[in-house]
Amino acid sequence: MKYPDFTLENKLSGVIAGVDEVGRGPLAGPVISAAVVFIDRNTIIDGINDSKKLTPQCRQVLYEKITSVAKFGIGMASVEEINSYNILQATKLSMKRALIDLDLELDYVLVDGNQPPEVKWQVKSIVNGDNLSTSIAAASIVAKVTRDRLMQELHNKHPEYNWYKNKGYGTKEHLNAIGLYGITEHHRKNFAPISRAL
């Protein structure tokens, strides 16, 4: 398996943040972004990869390692903001907030995908960036673990939707629960399965 590395970061100079989001697709819960900066790019953390390729246990271990050696920021766009704008604009807002939370003077921002937020720093969009850049892959892990923990908290309040397992995604189980119990304030009302249930 090929792992991300610092090739992209090393082609640039200065302080470089990797940014990624988690939670664009679910029917419930916020979208979360993380920004990660490895000040020392000689830092080696074995196993960093796109969070979708890792087990939950592996993500937890890597999260602890990443957050102990790297600078990081977290940004969230709420369900209310997703409902008010749209998921793309809410995602950009969460990315911008993650960079603000990072609270560093940056030279470049590497963003996974091709729809970056408008920020004051130089931005490079990297399609499949979480497979290429260690900074972006690390951000994907931090964002994923952060959102999973939040969905666990929401699950404790609404166990009937089993968000602990489905993380708010539109699984058959989740859709069946919506049919049985209706929707909560944590559901995204402008997403088709939810808007049809209103």
UniProtKB/Swiss-Prot annotation:
Superkingdom of the source species: Bacteria
Single GO biological process annotation from the record: mismatch repair
Cofactor: Mn(2+); Mg(2+)
GO molecular function terms attached to this record: manganese ion binding; RNA binding; RNA-DNA hybrid ribonuclease activity
Location, primary (coarse class): cytoplasm
Pfam family, one: RNase_HII
Catalytic activity, reaction form: Endonucleolytic cleavage to 5'-phosphomonoester
Record SUPFAM superfamilies: Ribonuclease H-like
Binding site for a divalent metal cation: 20-21, 112
Database matches in InterPro entries: RNase_HII, RNase_HII/HIII, RNase_HII/HIII_dom, RNaseH-like_sf, RNaseH_sf
Broad class of enzyme this protein falls into: hydrolase
Keywords per UniProt: Cytoplasm, Endonuclease, Hydrolase, Manganese, Metal-binding, Nuclease
Annotated RNase H type-2 domain residues: 14-198
Full protein name: Ribonuclease HII
